[in-house]
From Swiss-Prot:
Species: Nocardia farcinica (strain IFM 10152)
UniProt function note: Catalyzes the formation of the alpha-1,6-glucosidic linkages in glycogen by scission of a 1,4-alpha-linked oligosaccharide from growing alpha-1,4-glucan chains and the subsequent attachment of the oligosaccharide to the alpha-1,6 position.
Ranges of compositional bias, category Basic and acidic residues: 7-23
Catalyses which reaction(s): Transfers a segment of a (1->4)-alpha-D-glucan chain to a primary hydroxy group in a similar glucan chain
Spans annotated as Disordered: 1-23
Active site, renumbered: D424, E476
Protein name as catalogued: 1,4-alpha-glucan branching enzyme GlgB
UniProt GO MF annotations: 1,4-alpha-glucan branching enzyme activity; cation binding; hydrolase activity, hydrolyzing O-glycosyl compounds
Swiss-Prot/TrEMBL keywords: Carbohydrate metabolism, Glycogen biosynthesis, Glycogen metabolism, Glycosyltransferase, Transferase
UniProt-listed Enzyme Commission number(s): 2.4.1.18
InterPro entries: A-amylase/branching_C, Branching_enzy, GlgB, GlgB_N, GlgB_N_E_set_prok, Glyco_hydro_13_cat_dom, Glyco_hydro_13_N, Glyco_hydro_b
Disulfide bridge map: none
Organism placement in taxonomy: Bacteria, Bacillati, Actinomycetota, Actinomycetes, Mycobacteriales
Length: 744
């Protein structure tokens, strides 16, 4: 049937031609343009196989190809080039179940591959809902790069699924060495309004380097590393790396014991380590063997690692993280790090990790302005920038950002069996005016508390403690914020423990003084006992105290080398006896002279010096006695585990106190912080009999003068210090003596 006549045709005396229905093109020009620009929000509606009145239309994106065919049941069907690297044709197969794409490149090989645009999304509706609500605690199971293997009619298909959150992006494409970093073969689809983009790329497997080419809302195109990359290139290279894991863990018994352990009522002596400078040149597996041997011989219960999440700048010590889900490639693969943790667990050593959720660097290839807008960072510079460090601050009030961080905590615990997280820079998170002068914005109540950060920290601790009893969370928090280690159900932040920065500052300041002046500052050494049970504390002498001109424990001590060594030993004995767990940075356990530098190893040669070797021996014995003596750790968090004997003898610079164990044990700890010998210092004691000298830091084995009590002191019926009996104790200058009470 002909169409209606056009009056214009009659005017010109022309006979109208029959009108035919014009067939639609195999690809709409708008789709071609969007695919070419990398800004198509749903390329899967164009590419792949789709129903057609004459069968099935197959569209393939193969820029630079000379010929493209579709192989169905062993028969190749050629596709036509329709422009912009897209090839298409209608195949006479109404129900096309499976096929392969055959691509010929000029002067190159013929490549046969499955079509990634035929596969369904790897995230379900529940996943997307939980991400939007900020409640997907296993976020790493669905975002990031995951090697997969599918069974199809034409055989198995291996590849990698990629998924990334970028809600304001105009388009996202996976680029990598699989496509020569061209960025025009793997456009991703936006999954509804979730902000998640996803694609499956066949024949891409472990070891493939990749990034996301993000067309931002600001009009810029930036190649970003994957926020959930599980492995990375070796810095300074910045690509993410596809990886899987086939590691078989051997620490089931360790994890079972951990679940039933209360860390606050258990011994905890922590050796803080920077892996790159402990013994330079070692990988994770070599470090595991050598570090485990060292730590076990020294008697520590745990190691705490400066951040191992990937960071491009070594001089940041790991505190400017760009890949929160990837152990640094400097020392090996993720499975190598798993082996590191597993080996330490096998040696009876827990592994704590320094974790940095407060801020992240501005590198544009990482998290910064990820989709062309402030995405992970708070949009208001008064809240979103940390001026002191030149970094961005996470937007803790945004569901997806909070989810990213909370899930990351579970990731390290579940994927790498980490025993605890030391949370860095908590004070900077809690206060809106932290280091901001007058340029800060109050909260909705007009206060300076960051309510979103408080909610995040509470959620973090609730999630970790619910999912993994026995795992510790430790706050580096330097203010008097109340209830840092109290339960969230009573308004606290929910941390297991908190660093006692006040103890560290006061103690190091006191002992840096010449002994002749210490009596005028006696309150500095006693003040920490006023608030010792207000929180569950860790006493830290960390990396921060041995850098930037602060000196070391050795150089802080007054006097000649003999006096310095005595001062270090006395300090450590005081630290181990004080209520709270203890953390000591590497090198300080043998009194290293030089400040720490991440660019060089420790000065192990100093152990050839008897004084430095003596400090190391003293630390070994401190740990041995500490672990064997419940009085020193079982009641750290209750005043019932402590009592003063002598707090006020400022003239002779002597302190003495009792520690009580939940098993009924009692230890008296006596300290002489003067430069004089107190040959017969009388100490009041609660129990009559022979008290065993279980530690004396002036022992000759430690490099001391050998002043001691011959292993035992005997009480006399002389009331003293409000106690029914007493004994005289020989106290060398700058020394500590621990005495164990007789047991009934």
């Amino acid at each position: 049937m002909s169409g209606p006549e056009d009056p214009a045709d009659r005017r010109h005396g022309e006979v109208p031609a029959p009108r035919r229905d014009i067939p639609r093109p195999l690809v709409e020009r708008r789709d071609l343009m969007l695919l070419a620009a990398g800004t198509h929000r749903d390329p899967h509606t164009v590419l792949g196989a789709h129903p057609h009145p004459d069968g099935t239309v197959v569209r393939v994106l193969r820029p630079h190809a000379a010929k493209v065919s579709v192989r169905v049941g062993g028969v190749d069907h050629p596709l036509d080039s329709v422009g912009y690297g897209v090839f298409a044709a209608v195949l006479p197969h109404p129900e096309l179940m499976d096929y392969r794409i055959v691509t010929e490149y000029p002067g190159g090989p013929t490549v046969i591959a499955a079509d990634g645009f035929r596969f369904l999304p790897t995230l379900g509706e529940l996943d997307l809902h939980l991400i939007g609500e900020g409640r997907h605690e296993h976020l790493w199971h669905v975002l990031g790069a995951h090697p997969r293997r599918y069974t199809t009619l034409d055989g198995p298909v291996s590849g990698t699924s990629f998924a990334v959150w970028a809600p304001n992006a105009r388009g996202v494409t996976v680029i990598g060495d699989f496509d020569g970093w061209s960025g025009n073969t793997a456009p991703m689809r936006a999954l509804g309004t979730s902000g998640v983009w996803e694609v499956f790329v066949p024949d891409v497997g472990s070891g493939t380097k990749y990034k996301y080419r993000v067309h931002g809302a600001d009009g810029r195109v930036v190649d970003h590393a994957d926020p959930l990359a599980f492995a990375t290139e070796l810095p300074p290279a910045t690509a993410s790396v596809v990886t899987g894991s086939d590691y078989t863990w051997q620490d089931a018994q360790w994890l079972e014991r951990r679940r039933s352990t209360d860390p606050t009522r258990s011994p905890m002596s922590v050796y803080e380590v920077h892996l790159g400078s402990w013994r330079p040149g070692l990988g994770y597996r070599e470090l595991a063997e050598q570090l485990a041997d060292y730590v076990r011989a020294a008697g520590y219960t745990h190691v705490e690692l400066l951040p191992v999440a990937e960071h491009p700048f070594g001089g940041s010590w790991g505190y400017q993280v760009t890949s929160y889900y990837a152990p640094t490639a400097r020392f090996g693969s993720p499975d190598d790090f798993r082996a590191f943790v597993d080996h330490l667990h096998g040696a009876g050593i827990g592994v704590l990790l320094d974790w940095v959720p407060a801020h992240f660097p501005r590198d544009e290839w990482a998290l910064a302005r990820f989709d062309g807008t402030p995405l992970y960072e708070h949009p208001d510079p008064r809240r979103g920038e940390q001026l002191d460090w030149g970094t961005y601050v996470f937007d803790f009030g945004r569901n997806e950002v909070r989810n990213f961080l909370v899930a990351n905590a579970r990731f390290w615990i579940e994927e790498f069996h980490i025993d605890g997280l030391r949370v860095d820079a908590v004070a900077s998170m809690l206060y809106l005016d932290y280091s901001r002068g007058e340029n800060w914005e109050p909260n909705i109540h007009g206060g300076r508390e960051n309510l979103e950060a408080v909610a995040f920290l509470r959620e973090l601790n609730d999630v970790v403690h619910r999912a993994h009893p026995g795992v510790v969370t430790i706050a580096e928090e330097s203010t008097t914020w109340p209830g840092v280690t109290r339960g969230t159900e009573v308004g606290g932040l929910g941390f297991t423990m908190k660093w006692n920065m006040g103890w560290m500052h006061d103690t190091l300041g006191f002992l840096a003084r010449d002994p002749i002046h210490r009596s005028w500052h006696h309150n500095e050494i006693t003040f920490s006992l006023v608030y010792a049970w207000s929180e569950n504390y860790v006493l830290p002498i960390s990396h921060d105290e041995v850098v930037h001109g602060k000196g070391t424990l050795w150089t802080r001590m007054p006097g000649d080398d003999f006096a310095k060594a005595a001062g270090v030993r006395a300090l450590l004995a005081y630290m181990w006896a004080h209520p709270g767990k203890q953390l000591l940075f590497m090198g300080q356990d043998f009194g290293q002279f030089r400040e720490w530098s991440h660019d060089r190893g420790l000065d192990w040669g100093e152990l050839d010096n008897p004084l430095h070797r003596g400090i190391a021996t003293a630390v070994r014995d401190l740990n041995r006695v500490y672990r064997a003596t419940p009085a020193l750790w079982s009641q750290d968090t209750t005043p019932g585990g402590y009592a003063w004997i002598e707090a006020d003898d400022r003239d002779r610079n002597v302190l003495a106190f009792l520690r009580y164990g939940s098993d009924g044990s009692t230890v008296a700890c006596v300290f002489n912080f003067s430069g004089a010998l107190h040959g017969e210092y009388r100490v009041g004691l609660p129990i009559a009999g022979e008290w065993t000298e279980i530690l004396n830091t002036d022992a000759a084995d430690y490099g001391g003068s050998g002043v001691g009590n011959y292993g035992v002191v005997r009480t006399e019926e002389i009331p003293w210090h409000g106690r029914p009996v007493s004994a005289t104790v020989a106290l060398a200058p700058n020394s500590a003596v621990w005495l164990a009470a007789p047991r009934a």
